[in-house]
UniProtKB/Swiss-Prot annotation:
Its EC number is 3.-.-.-. GO terms for biological process: nucleotide-excision repair; pyrimidine dimer repair; response to UV. InterPro entries: UvdE, UvdE_bac, Xyl_isomerase-like_sf. It comes from Deinococcus radiodurans (strain ATCC 13939 / DSM 20539 / JCM 16871 / CCUG 27074 / LMG 4051 / NBRC 15346 / NCIMB 9279 / VKM B-1422 / R1). One of its GO terms (molecular function) is endonuclease activity. It is an enzyme of class 3 (hydrolase). Pfam families: UvdE. This is UV DNA damage endonuclease. The keyword Calcium does not apply.
Amino acid sequence: MTSACEAVPQLGLVCLTVGPEVRFRTVTLSRYRALSPAEREAKLLDLYSSNIKTLRGAADYCAAHDIRLYRLSSSLFPMLDLAGDDTGAAVLTHLAPQLLEAGHAFTDAGVRLLMHPEQFIVLNSDRPEVRESSVRAMSAHARVMDGLGLARTPWNLLLLHGGKGGRGAELAALIPDLPDPVRLRLGLENDERAYSPAELLPICEATGTPLVFDAHHHVVHDKLPDQEDPSVREWVLRARATWQPPEWQVVHLSNGIEGPQDRRHSHLIADFPSAYADVPWIEVEAKGKEEAIAALRLMAPFKKD
């Protein structure tokens, strides 16, 4: 395996393309609940089948465009974690061969897969019902990753933010008790409001959970001038130490629309932090998706002589 300090970073596509190539279907909860049980099953069978086909196409798209990192949409299979309704689980079981084939397509193309579920998942909420629904949702996502044939390691990361602020001790205490399909893939990311990397690092170290560093969030949280602040490099390296092996390290990359303090993500990446130059895996969180990746490849350290 190439050293993290020697490799040219791999740029990751997040879920969709701006173009029509990778676009998934969904259904609203209100629409779903208006259906009869038979109609629900038929609806999810059609929707899940379509999304698996699109996912299989995403593997081909990544391979064709030399993209070696892809974030799975956490909305691939709506209603899969719906309490008291096992329709989604039954449909996904029926489609298990197709789902596994899609996973093999990514593996065969050398594409690493990750997932970053919705922010309503708050494992350390002070409300028991939210904690319960959060574990249920994470378990459903882990089931999808299992169905794709993905390893139960941070190579196939299942990423969360720290959750409810001021409850870091509660988060650290519950991680060891998470179901193995979740716990063994779990990673934590700093955010711009509740949890800085300094607050997450002790949790990551205590639980063996890798830290995904986001420089944009760090700049906003600490009100820094830009992503060239020396602390960005410090946190790249400190986060890297939580990854085993360090060559698996993932970071997030984004720019603000109207400057470093703007939380909104820009269409393209104009400012690439020099601290990321030797990071092996970079998820590009730009609105321009594949367009942002193409533009980045014209910049150092990606531009080929």
